[in-house]
């Protein structure tokens, strides 16, 4: 396979920056939105002025920059994918992504059940005490991971409900799935990995297709596509899979709304509240498309009456994959919880994916 990421020193540097940007941008959007996740737009404006949020603000406990389960699960996705890439390199065989990501999600579940690292844990994300915070994790993620389902990496994506929480399409699938687009240069492969791993917790096809679509968008962005171009390519990929219609309709609505210009929180709310996967994805894409700057896009993605941390996280993933970490507002980023660990994990993933 001709891997563009290794074609030149410049390409390698760009790829590394986009991996860092995607993960740090997601954490930044998450931190912006977490403080207002359960607030209505009217409440946000009453508390922060007519423009709503214009910066990171303290959460209910007075702390600025905290991240939620969105960033936590994203980081454990990275840990699973990094292990899979290392296994493929050392043993010369692939195909373990779904099992290793599932194992990583099991470790995240452990962080939600314990007050801190167990005695003797000295490495990996399980050693990071800040990740043991319980920040309103999704019920489907918790109940799904209490089961033992490991998706078959070769299973066809038929549009049929998966065996775990078959009626659930909550945004817990999509908010954790950007790393699949960073770990493999082929968007269709990233799409399939993300969609299958989403089925560890959510069985509704819209839930797992939205996860696949974000992974595909990120994969295209790392290659230098525009946000619009990456979204259009993801739509073409979605169209090859039965049961894609709800996810595709949400993305098309985001594109159409962005084409109108004049962004506003009221227009964001025409896309939904973001509690379900396709709405969260559509809001993240819309905010990234319709604005002219990274800060404005992130703020638009969280100023609404819905799941602001998830929509902010998705928007941040997209913006960071497009612009790299250098394009993120560093004054804001400096306030984000765990940023040094996130950056180091991003560099580890990029390094592993670049090794022969």
Predicted regions and their residues:
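Structured, active/binding-site neighborhoods that engage oxygen-rich ligands
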Residues: 1-356
């Amino acid at each position: 396979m001709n891997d563009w990421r290794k074609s030149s020193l410049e390409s390698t540097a760009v790829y590394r920056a986009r991996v860092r940007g995607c993960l740090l941008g997601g954490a930044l959007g998450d931190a912006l939105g977490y403080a207002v996740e359960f607030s209505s737009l009217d409440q946000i404006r009453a508390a922060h002025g007519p423009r709503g949020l214009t910066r990171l603000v303290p959460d209910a406990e007075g702390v600025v920059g905290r991240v939620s389960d969105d960033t936590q699960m994203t980081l454990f996705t990275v840990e699973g994918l990094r292990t899979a890439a290392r296994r493929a390199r050392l043993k010369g065989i692939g195909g373990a992504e779904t099992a290793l990501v599932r194992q990583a999600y099991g470790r995240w579940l452990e962080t939600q059940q314990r007050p801190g690292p167990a005695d003797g844990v000295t490495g990996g994300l399980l050693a990071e005490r800040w990740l043991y915070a319980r920040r309103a994790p999704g019920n489907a993620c918790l109940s799904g991971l209490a089961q033992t389902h490991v998706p078959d990496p070769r299973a066809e994506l038929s549009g049929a409900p998966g065996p775990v929480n078959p009626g659930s399409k909550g945004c817990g699938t999509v908010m954790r799935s950007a790393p699949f687009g960073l770990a493999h240069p082929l968007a269709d492969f990233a799409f399939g990995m993300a969609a299958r791993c989403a089925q560890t917790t959510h069985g509704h096809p819209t839930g797992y297709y939205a996860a696949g679509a974000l992974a595909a968008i990120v994969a295209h962005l790392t290659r230098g596509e525009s946000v619009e171009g990456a979204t259009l390519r993801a739509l073409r990929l979605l169209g090859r899979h039965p049961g894609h219609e709800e996810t595709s309709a949400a993305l098309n609505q985001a594109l159409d709304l962005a084409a109108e210009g004049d962004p506003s929180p009221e227009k964001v709310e025409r896309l939904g509240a973001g509690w379900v996967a396709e709405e969260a994805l559509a809001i993240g894409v819309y905010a990234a498309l319709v604005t002219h700057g990274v800060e404005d896009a992130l703020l638009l993605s969280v100023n609404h009456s819905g799941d602001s941390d998830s929509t902010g996280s998705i928007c941040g993933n997209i913006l960071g994959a497009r612009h790299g970490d250098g394009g993120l507002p560093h004054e804001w980023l400096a306030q984000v919880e765990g940023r040094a660990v996130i950056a180091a994990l991003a560099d580890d993933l990029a390094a592993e994916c670049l090794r022969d």
